């Protein structure tokens, strides 16, 4: 695979690249990406699963056994199941969220797209998401895949991350900036 121009590096980048190359060789990139997205959604929805992958208290065997049960229940097998088990054996589960993000970026780049992570104060409608994709496409010059997460603490607005660039139009950030400006004056 040609070296990508993205900023993906480190442990997560190496694991993600290896998984992508295997998925590409077997023609299963979209299946692998779908399984990774499902696992990511499970992670976001379960504090216990987050604790399992982040806590050094669990031994590799305990993590592997618990992860195996989770993967079996979620019917995640094949490349992604084997990949996550390998990551657990190598004591790298803490980096799985970054690995998933890196895989998505690599897959998007291979499709001629770029990946954007959007954090919004409220859920976006299909129309808003479509308009956001169009606006981002006009800026980056490529089709954009968008992963939207909701964070009510932003109050209003968006935080958009594309590659190493971030645009923060959230009300929370604007209020914090105003607060700092008022402290400097007073």
UniProtKB/Swiss-Prot annotation:
* Pfam families per the UniProt record, alphabetical: OSCP
- The portions of this protein that span the membrane are none
Q: Does the keyword Metal-binding apply?
A: no
Q: Where in the cell is it found?
A: Cell inner membrane
**Keyword presence, Repressor:** no
GO molecular function list: proton-transporting ATP synthase activity, rotational mechanism
Enumerate the UniProt keywords alphabetically: ATP synthesis, Cell inner membrane, Cell membrane, CF(1), Hydrogen ion transport, Ion transport, Membrane, Transport
PANTHER family noted in UniProt: ATP SYNTHASE DELTA CHAIN
Function according to Swiss-Prot or TrEMBL: F(1)F(0) ATP synthase produces ATP from ADP in the presence of a proton or sodium gradient. F-type ATPases consist of two structural domains, F(1) containing the extramembraneous catalytic core and F(0) containing the membrane proton channel, linked together by a central stalk and a peripheral stalk. During catalysis, ATP synthesis in the catalytic domain of F(1) is coupled via a rotary mechanism of the central stalk subunits to proton translocation.
Family recorded in the similarity comment:
Belongs to the ATPase delta chain family.
Protein's name according to its UniProt entry: ATP synthase subunit delta
Name the source organism. Chelativorans sp. (strain BNC1)
Query: Which lineage do the record's taxonomy fields give for this organism?
Result: Bacteria, Pseudomonadati, Pseudomonadota, Alphaproteobacteria, Hyphomicrobiales
């Amino acid at each position: 695979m040609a070296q990508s121009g993205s900023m993906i590096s480190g442990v997560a980048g190496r694991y993600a690249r290896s998984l992508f190359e295997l998925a590409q060789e077997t023609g299963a990139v979209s299946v692998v990406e779908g399984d990774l997205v499902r696992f990511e959604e499970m992670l976001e929805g379960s504090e216990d699963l987050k604790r399992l992958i982040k806590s050094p208290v669990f031994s590799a065997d305990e993590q592997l056994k618990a992860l195996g049960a989770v993967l079996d229940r979620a019917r995640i097998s094949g490349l992604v199941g084997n990949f996550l088990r390998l990551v657990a054996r190598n004591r790298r589960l803490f980096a799985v969220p970054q690995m998933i993000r890196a895989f998505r970026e690599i897959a998007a780049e291979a499709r001629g797209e770029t990946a954007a992570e959007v954090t919004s104060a409220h859920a976006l409608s299909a129309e808003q998401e479509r308009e956001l994709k169009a606006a981002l496409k006009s800026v980056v010059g490529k089709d954009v895949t968008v992963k939207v997460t909701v964070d009510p603490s932003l109050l209003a607005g968006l935080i958009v991350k594309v590659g190493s660039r971030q645009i923060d139009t959230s009300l929370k950030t604007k209020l914090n900036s105003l607060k700092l400006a008022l402290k400097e004056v007073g």
